């Protein structure tokens, strides 16, 4: 693995990857795209397999969903679960992307923070769960 980044001599037990090297060229991350061809309407609930969510709120003629959207996070009960939400259309200042908690979870450990606004055009927000009740921006 000279010149590569990865895990040498991997031995991940429960999901059984034993005795082989893993390098970053073999890693793939699930991507969900929300745009005019896959328009969820004004709400989307993060699915179990979601990791990267690309959202285009641009006008429909430009390939977007042409509306604000609320994305509901899953429970923060899985420690280390990471979700990346990207304003792929660069239009979130016009059509906001709101990220909503699940149940009684919160953001950044603040019980009164039940949602966050993603309103920076073309930016992404990375959230990671503490395994208890909070999603943290990192």
Range-by-range predicted roles:
Residues 42, 51, 114-115, 123-125:
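Residue-level detector of solvent-exposed, low-hydrophobicity positions
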Residues 6, 13, 21-103, 130-138:
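Exposed extracellular interaction/assembly regions and N-terminal maturation sites
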Residues 1-2, 9-10, 20, 113-116:
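Parallel beta-helix/beta-solenoid repeats that form elongated, surface-exposed shafts/blades used
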Residues 121-131:
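Extracellular disulfide-bonded cysteine-rich modules/repeats
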Residues 101-121:
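Terminal beta-strand-rich extracellular "head" domains
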Residues 4, 14, 119:
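Small/polar loops that bind or transfer phosphate-bearing groups
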């Amino acid at each position: 693995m000279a010149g590569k980044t990865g895990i040498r001599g991997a031995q991940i037990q429960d999901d059984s990857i034993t005795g082989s090297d893993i390098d970053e060229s073999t890693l793939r991350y699930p991507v969900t795209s929300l745009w005019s061809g896959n328009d969820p309407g004004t709400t989307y609930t993060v699915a179990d397999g979601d990791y990267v969510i690309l959202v285009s709120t641009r006008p429909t003629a430009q390939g977007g969903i042409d509306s604000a959207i609320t994305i509901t996070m899953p429970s923060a009960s899985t420690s280390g679960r990471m979700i990346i939400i990207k304003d792929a259309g660069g239009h979130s200042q016009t059509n906001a992307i709101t990220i909503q908690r699940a149940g009684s979870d919160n953001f950044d450990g603040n019980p009164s923070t039940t949602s966050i606004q993603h309103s920076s055009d073309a930016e992404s927000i990375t959230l990671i769960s503490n395994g208890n009740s909070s999603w943290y921006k990192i």
